[in-house]
Amino acid sequence: ISIATNSGSVNFGDSGDDIHRFTGSLDISGSRISFDDGKQNIAIGTNSIGASGFTGTTNIAIGENAMLDANGANTNYNIVIGYNAGKSFGANNVYSNILIGRQAGMNINSGDASNTIAIGTNAGIDITSGQRNLLIGTEAGTNISTADYNVAIGYHAMHGDDSTAGTGNSNIAVGYEALKGATTGYENVAIGNSAGTSATTAYRSVIIGASAGDAITTTPGVVLIGYNAGGAINHDDAAYTVAIGQNAGAAITSGRYQTLVGYNAGVSITEGDSNTFIGHNSGDALTTGLENTALGYSSLGANITGQRSVAIGNNALGTNLASGWTYNTAVGWGAGSNNTVGSSGTFIGSKAGYNATGSYNTFVGTSAGEGGTTSAP
């Protein structure tokens, strides 16, 4: 033991590679304690940076087996913290990764996986060569293997299928179990608790809102925004559905080419095709009708199976009780509303044809034909 009394220092050993073991407590005071191996690496924990002859520089490995197998050239600038985190670094050019959490990025073994950020228990655990992924949350992106450019934030976000390697690129999943089932699907955006949670191979969809699109598995190209929007879609026939608003299109299973905007817009549609409903409760009773257009609060609001009608204005064709009412055109507040039987009518003006019961009628003007029962021809 050498004591330098002029500075108050205590020196142990004769060279920098001497090993020192302490039994009991070790109390160190002062400004810092350095764990530097001469290459600007810091390794703390059993087997951290465990490979002999490691030549990488400027790495931080903290935890048992952190960077255990690291031995490739240019393995630099990594921050790895946690049991088995980054354990399999064995290739050249594995650099600039941030892995924090038990087994985070444990199987990365290719320089292609550089610039990965995985934070959370098992986050990115199956990544081998997938590059530039950002994964934050317990088991976020767990089954991603070779996929690139994904962002998963939240518990089980983009978790994937334990039996299928995740290879889909360029997905964004934010929220508890958002895109949880993703395997090969690509270029999806899912934001919200359980948004798109069952999607496996679906692609190029935008799903925003808690439980929005949560039954989708393979359906591509949907835009679903709002709580439970498109929540029952489960068939590829419903591809390219647009449903915006709480519960918009919530019952659609296989209905095609729908555009639904507003709270409860088209909420009851199951298999109807090519409907466009814009407005609070617009088309909210329709189930299997097709090629209808409704614009305004509660427009076309009570028709169940009607087809090829146009309703523009609040309550236009709004409380139509004829379930199969078809080929009607109504423009104006309440136009054609409360019609119990009738098809192929034209109602233009506020309350035009209101309470009318006939078919093939044309009523133009405020309250024109209100309460009428005439049919023509």
Regions from the language model: what does each represent?
Residues 1-31:
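A signal for long, low-complexity, Ser/Thr/Asn-enriched, surface-exposed stalk/shaft
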Residues 23-377:
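Glycine- and small/polar-enriched repetitive beta-structure motifs of secreted/surface proteins
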